[in-house]
Amino acid sequence: MPGENASTTTDSGDERVCSVESTSALTTEYPRDEKCRILSLDGGGAKGFYTLGVLKEIEAMLNCPLWKRFDLIYGTSTGAIIAALLALGKEVDEVHELYKKHVPKIMMSKSMVDKSAELKRCAESVFKELQFIDVKTGIGIVSTKWALERPMIFKNSVSQAHGRIGSFVPGFGVPIAAAIQASCSAYPFFDRVTVRTSQGDEIELVDGGYCANNPTLYAIADAT
C-alpha cells in the first residue's frame, strides 16, 4: 500500500519476486529451467526515498550491487527511475544522491508546464543518450498509452519479447531518458509525453501508474 514500505520475497512457480512497496530483474539470456530473480519497484513520487532506504538494506545484506543479483528489474514512475539507475550499474547510495539533487526541483515546480520541463531536463541530465542496450541486466519500464489506456513497457532483452521476437528492438528504439519521462508523467500534474519508436511511430504516453503502479505481474509474465 502507498505509504507502507516493506521488502517481501516470495516464490511464484519458478520465479523469485522481491517487491519493495511504495516503490521490481532478467539477464539478456537466462536458462528457463533456473529461477528468475525479480525486483519490482512501484510508483509513489517522492516516496521513492523510502524505497531507497529499503534497497540500501537489501544491498548491504547481499554485499554487492543489486543488478548482479536480480535478473529482472521492473519499475513504474518513481520506481522506473530507480530501476533504470540500478540496471545501469549504480549502487543505492549513488541513486540516493541523484534523488536528493533532482527530485525536489521537480516536485517544487508549480505548474504542469514547469514540472514537465524540469522532469525532462533532469531525465536528460542523468541518463543523457543512454539506450536500453546499455543496461547490465533485464529491465522493464512501465508507461501507459494515453489513447488506448494500455501499458507500453520498455524492455532490453529479446527474452522478454514473447511472440514478437522477429521485430523486437530494445526499448522500441527510445532513449532511456524519454522512457523514464513517460513513466513518470502523471497527467494532469505533468504533460503527456510523445515518443518516437525505431519504426517511426509516435505514441503519446502517460505515467505507468495508470495501468500498473506495481509492475510485479508484468515482470512475472516476462519471466515465464
Role assignments for model-derived ranges:
Residues 18, 32-40, 46-127, 166, ...:
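Patatin-like phospholipase
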Residues 134-224:
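Active-site gating loop/helix substructures
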